[in-house]
A protein has these predicted regions:
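Active-site hotspot residues in diverse enzymes, especially metal/ion-binding acidic/histidine motifs
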Residues: 2-263, 268-402
Length: 402
């Protein structure tokens, strides 16, 4: 069915409602039966309409348009005579559905476990409200209102609508979390610049070293949250300036010890060298496939490598990397964990050679994981199913640094 209606002066655009609905159901993983139940439309009729087409009542079309976020007002004038005398109500359920699927990437939220796989619409609303502490799902629009530059750039940064929804969800959670943590320490750039020079030494303590660095940074006015990878975002890290203080997100995407430190130092580079630009653009996201045009990612990567192992020492790595006892000796001499040597060596190779060398040195005996390092500082609202609880746990952890 195409919605088409001519009046004396206006011809309304042909819109294949059936095709739009098919795409919507497929992209969001919604069963026809669930949509039919929620909209109060006979399931067999809706299935037949989607597969074969045919006539559909105007009131039913309006419900579907609301779910698809098609403005019904565009068509109401042309169909106003059809509206008169109809006894079928257009309920709020279609509006609820439209809100949910226009604001949230439901399939991704199911994938990360925030929403149960077979949850119905009411259950989806309840689970999202429980996560945020909402009384009503519509509170999402006024929750953690992002600064104008932050919001406009987030919509510009991710062009696909599906990614944009997950990206905004991610940003809202983080922005709200940083605001609630509310680091009381003033940002001390000079001390940060000096401290960064010594961060490599903390890598030798694979259990408490990373935690100690995070707490020192907090005292310097830099708040760092370390999170598991959130499906649908593809972000290695991010830096925001909130209330005049740097706020950093490190994503434990690869679960590799050396990557954790490289990601942290990468973001600290931007704080030290791009602070004024960060204030103007509101935030910076580090991602492999979409480099930031405002900031120099190559310089940040080089800085991170140099802060862990200086260039002159890195030049010696190809000669010793095959001999584990030499790697251990070098690690002790330059005060880093052996895993850092293997990791930095691999990161410095071109992609073709890196793949071959990774097969030799990518095992857990060379590249250790991050589980021990981030145990006490992991920020995992998704795992806890509760954003407020995750924030409170981090606030308690940061209190130990004051």
């Amino acid at each position: 069915m195409y919605i088409l209606k001519k009046t004396n002066n206006i011809e309304y655009e042909n819109v294949s409602l059936r095709e739009e609905l098919k795409v919507f159901l497929q992209s969001n993983g919604i069963p026809v039966s669930a949509l039919a139940e929620q909209l109060g439309i006979d399931r067999r009729f809706l299935e037949r309409y989607i597969s074969e087409g045919g006539d559909i009542k105007f009131a039913q079309a309006i419900k579907i348009m609301q779910v698809l976020d098609i403005e019904p007002a565009k068509f109401i004038q042309g169909f106003k005579n059809d509206l008169e005398g109809t006894s079928e109500e257009i309920t709020d359920e279609s509006t609820n559905l439209s809100f949910l699927y226009s604001r949230f990437d439901i399939p991704s939220l199911k994938e990360i476990g925030l929403i149960k796989k077979r949850a119905k619409i009411d259950e989806i609303k309840e689970q999202i409200c429980s996560f945020f502490g909402f009384q009503n799902i519509y509170e999402y629009d006024t929750f953690a209102i992002l600064p104008e530059a932050l919001f406009s750039r987030s919509t510009r940064y991710i062009k696909e609508q599906k990614s944009a929804r997950m990206n905004e969800f991610w940003l809202k959670c983080l922005y709200h979390s940083f605001k609630k943590i509310d680091n009381p320490n003033p940002f001390d750039r000079e001390l940060l610049e000096e401290f960064v020079k010594h961060i490599y030494e903390y890598t030798t303590d694979e259990i408490h070293g990373y935690e100690k660095v995070i707490l020192v940074l907090y005292n310097l006015g830099v708040t760092v949250l370390t999170q598991p990878y959130v499906s649908g975002t593809g972000k290695y890290g991010a830096t925001m300036i909130i209330d005049g203080k740097p706020c950093v997100v490190i994503t434990d995407m690869n679960k590799k010890y050396h990557k954790l430190w490289l990601s942290l130092l990468h973001e600290l580079y931007h704080i030290l060298n791009d602070y004024d630009m960060l204030q103007k653009i509101a935030y910076h996201i580090t991602t492999k496939d979409n480099p930031d045009l405002f900031l120099n990612e190559d310089s940040a990567d080089a800085f991170a490598l140099n802060m862990l192992i200086k260039q002159s020492d890195r030049e010696e790595l190809p000669q010793i990397i095959r001999l584990s006892h030499m790697v251990m000796k070098a690690a002790k001499a330059i005060h880093v964990h052996p895993s850092i040597i293997y990791g930095v060596y691999l990161e410095g190779l071109d992609s073709k050679k890196q793949s071959a060398e990774f097969r030799k040195y990518g095992s857990s005996s060379c590249l250790i994981g991050t589980e021990k390092a981030i145990k006490n500082v992991i920020f995992d609202p998704i795992g806890l199913q509760d954003l407020r609880k995750a924030i409170e746990l981090m606030r308690q952890e940061f209190k130990s640094a004051v």
